[in-house]
Structure formats: C-alpha cells, structure tokens
C-alpha cells in the first residue's frame, strides 16, 4: 500500500499559530509532504493567508470584525495572532519555495484568478481546492494544468461526481464520511482522496488502511510516527 502524503493543516497548527509563517516553517522541519492553507482576497487584491473571513486580534477596535475583503494588505499586516502577522500567499511561497506541495483552499470571493496567477507555474508543487466548486471550475478554465480538488463534508450518493464535474484530481473528504467504497470509487476514475482533519492515531491508521492518498492533520509528527515514517 502506498504511503499517504502527510499534509500540515494550516501548517503545523498543533504547535504554532495556524496559517502563520512559523507554522509553515515548522511543517517543513517536521518533514511534512505538503501544507494546506486558506486564502482571502484583500481590498487591494492581495491574497492573505487566513481561515476566517474577518480576522481577530485587531490592533484597533474599529478594525475588529471587519472582513478581509474590506481591508488592505497594509492594514491586515498590523494584525497579530499570538504574535504572528497574517502572511500573504506570496510570503508563504517564498518561504517554502518548492520544498513541498502547497495546497491552497480558495475561501473568499475572487480568489481563484489571483491564486492561479501565483501558482500556475508550479503544478508539481501546488494545487487548489474549495468547498465552492464554482471557484474550482474557474481555476480549471484559468490554469488547466494546475491540479484541482473539491472539499466535501458529507457523503453524496455518487461522491466522485463532484470531482468529475470540475475535472479534478483530489477529493478532500472529511474523514468521518470516508469508507472503502468512496476511496475505491475515486480511485476508479484515477482521482485521489485526501482525508481531513485527522488528528488521532486510531483515525490516522484507519484512513491509511483505506488507501487514502493524503492525510491532512494538525499534528505532523504524530502522523509520521503513527505510520512509522
């Protein structure tokens, strides 16, 4: 059975503030095969790496709760989460270079085009995915050579159809809704299954036994140790 990729969920978020440069650097140190991150588009078009639509830890009360798309890159760089600034996608790409794969989740409206512009020249070291399958379809049109994936937190009757609809490669499946039939169905169309977010030894062993292609986890060291890597 092939060894699954170990993908650091928002970086090594079990040890460092999520989606921070420190978390991504730590993921490299721990031997992750890839990092997963989230992007939103700032008001000036910059892609900011952050999970929620509106960042917390604002330096000024007037900025608290303001959505990323209403703030400039300069304003967003004044935010701190446990001492860590919000990085741009370019910051992360500069940090990791091509040492591992960058899996970019398209979160906010208008993120597909700028993400594709930054990632299209590194198809072996980057991919995009989203819960909004329309954005994945847009990425297919803009950067057909860039690997694509769809996120699912349910179990459709034909789980592989959403992947086929965007000519995608990776099905990001919430691990609680993952079984052998789903893995086999995706593999039958030459797709890949990435299980998320898998954080306990028993769950890591279970999804690995199903033959998943990637395990997205907050705990890279735990996953590697559990699998004997």
Feature locations, PLM:
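Phosphate-group recognition and catalysis centered on beta-loop-alpha active-site segments
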Residues: 1-229
